[in-house]
Each structure stands twice: as C-alpha cells, then as structure tokens.
Amino acid sequence: MVIREAVASESRPAATEAKAMFSWIRPISRGWRICSAENLIVAAAFLLAATPATSPSHAQAPATPIRIDASRPAQEPDLAQYDEGSATAPNGDTLGLNSRYLMRNGKPWLPVMGEIHFSRVPRERWEEEILKMKAAGVDIVSTYVFWIHHEEVEGHFDWNGQRDLRAFAQLCARHGMMLQVRIGPWDHGEVRNGGLPDWVLKQGPTRVNDPIYLASVHIWYAQIAAQLKGLLWKDGGPVIGVQLENEYSKRGPGAGEAHILELKRIAVACGFDVPFYIVTGWDNASVPPRAVLPVYGGYPDAPWDSSITKLPPDEVYAFRSQSRVTAGAAEDSTRLAPDTKTPTAEQLPFLTAELGGGIEDTYHRRPVIAPDDIAATVPVMLGSGVNLYGTYMFQGGTNPDGALSTLQESQDTGYPNDLPIKSYDFQAPLGEFGEERAALRKLKVFQYFLNDFGAELAPMTVSVPEMQPRNPADFSVARASVRSSGNYGFIFCNNYVRGYVMPARPAAQFLIRLPHGELAVPRHPIDLPSGAYFIWPFNFNADGITLRYSTAQLFARVADSGINTLYFEAVRGIPVEFAFDATTVRTLKASSGETLRDSGTMIVSGFQPGVESSIDALSAQGNQVRIVVLTAHEAENAWKVRLGGSDHLLITDQDLVADRDAQPGQIWLRSRGAPRFAFTLTPPIASPLKANLPLALSSTTSGTSSFSAEAPSWSVPLEYHQIQTAGTAPPVKLGPAFDWRPNRVAQAPGPGDLPQAAEWEITVPEGSLTGLSELFLQIDYQGDVARLTANHRLLDDDFYNGKPWLVGIRRFLAPQGPSTFELSILPLREDAPVYFELGELAHFGSSGQIDKVDDIRLIPEYQLEITPGESLGRKTD
C-alpha cells in the first residue's frame, strides 16, 4: 500500500474534494490537534455556506481587476495590552511595543527570527551557523532549551559541550544577534516526551499547577537562569524574551491561564526579567491578559495527519484576513478563550514564531518540501499583518545521544508520530549539516526587504480585496492584500499553492482606492502567471522621488558614495515596469526599455533586468537615485556584505558565510562538488581583495566587479561493498489512536527489526578532508529506513522520501587512519501504509519489498576565503 504522488494536478474523487473543503480546519501545531466544539461548529457553518460544490477550482480565472479599498484614514496604534519586563539596556537602547507593532528605541521594528536548537548542533559549528543566519537577514535567534537534554537523570545537570547554553548565548551576543529562549518546561520540538525527562513523568501530573511538578520546574528554570545570568537585555546581553510552555490549551483546575501565570511567576522569581514573555497562540491557547504575548505560525504540510494520500490545499497559502490562527477561520484562538478579559487581536501585534521553514518527515508521511513551498508563504503572512517574522526551523540538526534512551519523539512513548532517532533535518533552509538550500536563497530576498524596509512596513494596516477566496481550496479568486499608511504602501500577492497548479490570471490589475484617489497597478492589465508571488511597492519615497509603482519586488538598499541604490527582483513571467511621479523627477535615464510620460507620470516599460541594467535618476531636490533590477536568479543569489568599510551585494551561485557587520570584513564561499568559484560585487569594490586561492578579476564596469577562482581538484577513492543481504521485512505495525486522530498510523521499525536490514561497509581514506571545508557522503538508495553507524554507534538516520541522503561526515571522521562506516537499509514493504510524495520506486518483485543502493559517492566542499587585501586580483583576458 505504498502511496506515491504522481501528478500535482491530478483529478480526485468527490470524497477527497469534500475533504479539501474542510482542510483548513487542520491546525498548525506539529503533531497535536485540539479543536474546541466552537471551532468546529463555526467552521462547518462557514464552509456549508461558502464552499463551492467542487474544490479546488482549476478553471481559468476570469479577467477581472483586483479591487482593494485602502482609503480609510490611517489611525494611530493604541497602547498594547501587555506589561513588559525590563526593556532598557545599559547603553539606553529600548525595546517595546504597541497594539500594532514592536519598537526599538521608540521606532517601528519588524525583525526576522529564525530557530536553531543549539543542543542539536555540534558546538564547533555554532558560530558558523549563527553567521549564516545573520548573513541571510535573521535578527533574532530562537532556541528551545530541552529539559531532557540537560537533566535526563534527576539532579544531574549537563551544560557542557553542545549543551552549553551560556556559550551559545555569548556567541549570539558577539555577533549582534538577539536571542529568544524557549524554556518550556514542555517544548515539543519532536523530542522525547516533548522535552520532559522520564523521571518528571513518573512524579505525577505535569503541565498543571501540581506542587511536585512545579517544584521541579522551579529548579529547572533556576538552572537556565543561572546559565544566562548577565546575558539578559537589561544587562546588555542578547536575551530579549522567553517562551513559556508550548501549544498549551489545557483547561480546568490548576491549568489554563492559571498555569501560564504560575510559570511566569516562577520564571521571574528565578531572574528572567525580560521585555517579552511569549506563548504560542494556536489551538485555543491559554493567553492570560497583559502577562504574555501570543505568537502564531503555519506549516506547508501536515506529516502528523493520518492520511496516506495527498492532502488538500494548505491554509498557509491563503491570507489570514479573519484570524491569526488559520485562513478562513471565524475566530482567533485568543477570542475563544473562556476569560472574557483575554486580549483581542486588535490589542496586540501579530507576531509569529513558527512559520515553517520546512517540515519533518514522519514515518507514515514523507513530504518533500520545494523552495517555493516555503517562500510563497512570506508575502501571504506579511500581507496578513505579521509584524515579527519567525521561522521554524531555520537550521536543521541532529539529536544528541541520550544517557538512558534515544531522544526523539515516538509512538512508543505515547506521542503521535515516529521521527528518525538522530536526524532533525526538517528540510530547513540550512540543513542538518549546515548546507545552504534553495529555500534559504528565496527566503533571503524577503528577509532583506524586512531588514531595510520593515520599519516602514510595520505601522501599515491591512486592506483586503472586495473578492476573496471562500476557503483555502478556492482557486477561482486572486489572493492578495495591501498594507498601507495613507497613500503609501505595498501590494502582496500569492498565486502559488503547494502540490496544486494555480490558474494563470489573465488581464490582472490591482485597483487600489487610496485617500487621494485610485491607483492602477500596473497601468495596463498583465497576465499573472501560475506560481507567481511577490511584494510590490506603491507611492514609495525613493530619496525624494515618488515611485508610483513597480512590477518588480523591492528587496534591498545600499548606499555608496552618496548615491542610494535600490535593488529590485524581477518576478518570473511578469514584465518589468516602473512608474514615477514626474513632478519629483528632474532627470531619468534607463539602460533599457522605453521611457514615456503619461498624465504626470514618467513610465519605464519593457525594462530588461540584470545586474548591469539600471535606472539612474535625479530628484527634484537634486538627490541621486539608482535602481537596479536583478533577475530572479541574481536576486536569490545576492548577499549583503561589507568589505573594506563599504556595503555591497555579492552575487554568487556558491554558499556563503559572512559577518556583514564585521570590519574590515571576511567572507567564505563554499562550492559543493565543483572547485570553481565566481562572484560579482555591486556596487564595484574600490579597495583591494585577497584570497586563499589565486583570485582573478574577470571583469569590471561602472556598476560591478566580477571575480573568479579555482581550487585544486580533489579526488579520493571511496570503497564500499555489501556485507549482508536483507531478510524479510516484518509487517508494518500500527501505533495507538488519539482522540484528535482516531485513525492509527504506521509505526517505525524497532530494534528487533534491524537484523533484517541489508548492510554495506564504507571506507573513507585518511586525509580525505585536506583542503576542504566539509566532505559529504551522498547515498542514493531505495528502502524504508537507512542508518549510518561507526563501531555500532548510530551517527545519523533517514526515512527514505525519494531524495538522495546527504550526510556531512567531517564530524565523524577518525583523527588518524581511514574511517569505516556501516550503512544499513531496512527493506520497504510494498504493503507499507506510508505516503511518499516523491520517487518512483523500482519494481518490488516477487519478494514484495525493496532495498536498493544505486550509488554511494563522496562530494567535496571547497572553500574560498576573501578579505580586503593588497590587490584587486589578477586581471584575466
């Protein structure tokens, strides 16, 4: 019964279509579902009234304008219904908030937050991974502190090695990264018992105001506080907030808001005096008024779902105009809380902590996340009013070894899903071994936009189109919104849904009613391609020049020699057009396209994007402004860096590590597989560069400097051979049922099943790392579960999902001599009740099972180190 997805736009039976109508009721929490009767009644009534007979609709969209009324007068935000802790640092810097947005030093602030779990990453890699996150535009690092990782045995605390929270926080401080600490006591994070040690469960009731439980929590919180002493915001440190509990919606005596308040009281008593105390806000969460801030999220898939078929369209691709919890929901979870004093959405800013940067593979559901699956959610969430963009996970990891047990979530421990024992890759933008994925590059474009223009976006309010989708499965209506302040703002649009083909929208045009009249964007209707998503500015003040609109996405600002350069990204499939208020422009010259005047507007149409193409203008006040429109490929590969005291965009296909605030600047480029490097700097660099490899200046223009380098080619033989053939895989067992998921799901094989695995021995020669930053072992296989061991110690594991398994082995190589690994692959049974999104499995044959290795190879990762130096490089012809 192995289920394989074949075609994204397949036709589906009526029962499946009906399921699509109700798909958005599915909550976003990773593995838990708590739906109140009120939620279900409201949802059912809404859908019966609004849902079409067949859904999703794949019909060609009609040629209709997208009308949005954003004419209401801008209103000042109210005071937030929240009492923050100490919010002033010793240097006078302050953090705060009002009812609409966060503030830094009294000014609007829209930060980017990314999740990494320090205890799942080797200590020696922390600094590099923090720098990667920073280079990609992350402002705040978020991390769980898993109780079971630090006190697996009662009274024996481990804060050493990769469990050293204090050292991790100090690294964040060193690199100017703020830190949000999620202190539990229950965390989830796909960890055993949600992070609670086994001995805590044996004490009695948990997650309620039980005296024995709270006494243990007090000791736990005090331990964390001791680790972070002197590192809080008020001390000049990076810790700006703590999260209490997670996905908490218990009600009853000693539970609910009373429990959250007690946890906060204990945290404060232990020394946690921070600006922001947060709780997750979904699943009818407990949000005591004024004490905590709710944060929200959403994921591109639901591997905790019991279905082993393709899921309906996910709500995360539809704008949340009525709720912060889910698109189309009638009520926000905070409004459903029994305490009528609970703050409403209008009294607190829309903050997020768990917008999926990927998703885990569970044993029974193995989704494969594409880069657009992640990036397309960004304009949706920002266009829904989000004013803290928090990604879970931003960096994957590996579960540490436990002293008493393995540390992953499993059905054997009463939890709903089976996860790999070691791997927590999460298909994140930064993988388990630090590899930079395409999703990182796409996310980075939006994160740079928030870095440079978030302060302008934060105060803006949301306006929605006159016509909106009736539910997330309704594809017949364009998905869009506007955030604006007066006549100035941004258009947000998404025409992408994971796993489905959205219709192209011919003759699309945004007609925005503003306080001073209507604005048409663009001036003539265009065809909106299937799969497009973007953020476009309108009436944007470009250093004195009013940009009426652009059909390219603004994403970065770089100042160079008194000239502000604005960088835009061309949206694939949409012609680039700029319209300027002619009264604000003295002169304008475009390197391509046609420039014309129309009713007081200066229009550049047919502009050809590329790093060498620009629009150079002089404002009526005499300010020089340059606009550069990069192709989508160039923008996704552009990094903001600082070299020799000046800011640049560095465009490269290679991975990048850099501290963009460091002086004079140092950059590491990484190339996986090929020894060649190439990069372009814009604006061009005036100071010299040096590198660890011969660096050639391949070209220079008025707008760019381009360089290339090549490392000595690496070649090391890899030896592997099969040492055991597979036995007969046992029938797949089903795990327990749950109230919220009555259908039982497949359970991962246990230790008793391992003797049936096929085995291979892999030998990596001594010295294989010479000249490399990392060495990856790529295993192309088909099977059920794969494990990599050395001397019978499990190093990493994988649930097969149709993609090659990539393992960074630098951390596993022997210090001397060759390194030997054992690869075991448990056969996949043809009748396994498991969902595979990708991968055409080979013929199972008469055995009814498959365990197959197509190839095992080593992939070198080369490194180019760049710093300001003595020469610009060797000029090439």
Describe the function of each predicted region.
Residues 202, 213-228, 235-243, 256, ...:
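Carbohydrate-binding surfaces of carbohydrate-active enzymes
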Residues 768-791, 798, 823-824:
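Aromatic-lined ligand-binding clefts that engage carbohydrates, nucleic acids, or primary amines
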Residues 38-52:
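Bacterial N-terminal signal peptides
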Residues 61-140, 869:
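N-terminal carbohydrate-binding accessory modules
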Residues 620-625, 827-835:
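Short acidic/polar inter-strand loop motif in beta-rich domains
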Residues 126-192, 264, 268:
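Aromatic-lined substrate-binding rim segments of carbohydrate-active enzymes
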Residues 508-512, 581-582, 783-795:
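Short, surface-exposed beta-strand/strand-loop-strand elements in extracellular ectodomains
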Residues 174-328, 335-361, 380-386:
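Active-site region of glycoside hydrolase catalytic domains
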